[in-house]
Curated annotation (Swiss-Prot):
GO terms for biological process: malate metabolic process; tricarboxylic acid cycle. The active site is at H177. NAD(+) binds at G7, A8, A9, G10, G11, I12, G13, D34, N94, I117, T118, N119, M227. The gene is mdh. Pfam families: Ldh_1_C (PF02866), Ldh_1_N (PF00056). The keyword Lipid metabolism does not apply. InterPro entries: L-lactate/malate_DH, Lactate/malate_DH_C, Lactate/malate_DH_N, Lactate_DH/Glyco_Ohase_4_C, Malate_DH_AS, Malate_DH_type1, Malate_DH_type1_bac, NAD(P)-bd_dom_sf. NCBIfam families: MDH_euk_gproteo. Homodimer. One of its GO terms (cellular component) is cytoplasm. Keywords: NAD, Oxidoreductase, Tricarboxylic acid cycle. This is Malate dehydrogenase. It comes from Shewanella frigidimarina (strain NCIMB 400).
Length: 311
């Protein structure tokens, strides 16, 4: 099993690479790529950790060597948010980065499962899809926007609010991966009841959690460590699915035939071909239904931006 991390020298990339080095199955290969010259050194640093995961690092303009034979590609390359920016402000820089990297993926490892971390995810996943379509290798079951950070934040915040063991908290987050498009389905959390005020406050906190971190870091970065953990969880789930493990379910932003938008985050069953099945997200409350319907214009606009960028 070979996993490639693109953008591996950045804050998210290094955290993700560390977690993968310690958690990937024995015998796996971990391939790190970044434009930054430090990248081979990051690989050497990680190689001293005593796990049976081989690490190699590649720097420079061309990620091809890092991508050869990759089963899973996790893309975190791009610039991070600073105070006063929202995820859409990142579009102007990150759109081109994602396009260029995906052109290499399309040629070098078109069958790989690709998880996009680079923001704005609502748009960058659409860019990735268009690049793969133009190359004639698009498979909607192999492309994912990683929204796991919204899920782990939801789990954490709910456990804190209600005094629960966080390992027991399960919550689906649907929609997209920015602002109002992030919709945690709090009505479905088992064994917990929320007041209307708690639902409104919790939903807003989850939607704005990225900004909470950006402001707390005071210009020193964005959510890198928690995003690294979220991406590792999702990446390991992709690997487990590829290895034939049963009942591997995660939420992700996918081209899954949703009635709501071309790309929509909801629970998916993972397997040997990526998405084995898009799962229904179930009964939702009136508050959630209203929030879902209200986000769709924003989400569709984000997707359209990505499609038009590649044209």
């Amino acid at each position: 099993m070979k996993v490639a991390v693109l953008g591996a020298a950045g804050g998210i990339g290094q955290a993700l690479a560390l977690l993968l080095k310690t958690q990937l199955p024995a015998g796996s290969k971990l391939s790190l790529y970044d434009i930054a010259p430090v990248t081979p050194g990051v690989a050497v640093d990680l190689s001293h950790i005593p796990t049976d995961v081989e690490v190699k690092g590649f720097a420079g303009q061309d990620p091809t060597d890092a991508l050869v034979g990759a089963d899973v590609v996790l893309m975190s390359a791009g610039v991070a948010r600073k105070p006063g920016m929202d995820r859409s402000d990142l579009f102007n820089i990150n759109a081109g980065i994602v396009r260029n990297l995906m052109e290499k993926v399309a040629v070098t490892c078109p069958k790989a499962l690709v998880g996009i971390i680079t923001n704005p995810v609502n748009t960058t996943v659409a860019i990735a899809a268009e690049v793969l379509k133009n190359a004639g290798v698009y498979d909607k079951n192999r492309l994912f926007g990683i929204t796991t950070l919204d899920v782990i934040r939801s789990e954490t915040f709910i456990a804190e609010l209600k005094g629960l063991n966080v390992a027991d908290v399960k919550v689906n987050v649907i929609g997209g991966h920015s602002g109002v498009t992030i919709l945690p389905l709090l009505s479905q959390v088992e064994g917990v009841t929320f007041t209307d005020e708690e639902v409104a406050a919790m939903t807003t906190r989850i939607q704005n959690a990225g900004t909470e971190v950006v402001e707390a870091k005071a210009g020193g970065g964005s959510a890198t460590l928690s995003m690294g953990q979220a991406a590792c969880r999702f990446g390991l789930s992709l690997v487990r699915g590829l290895q034939g493990e049963a009942n591997v379910v995660e939420c992700a932003y996918v081209d899954g035939g949703s009635e709501h938008a071309t790309f929509f985050a909801q629970p998916i069953l993972l397997g040997k071909n990526g998405v084995e099945k898009v799962l229904p997200y179930g009964e939702i409350s009136a508050f959630e239904a209203n929030a879902r319907d209200a986000m769709l214009d924003t989400l569709k606009g984000d997707i359209k931006l990505g499609v038009e960028f590649v044209k």
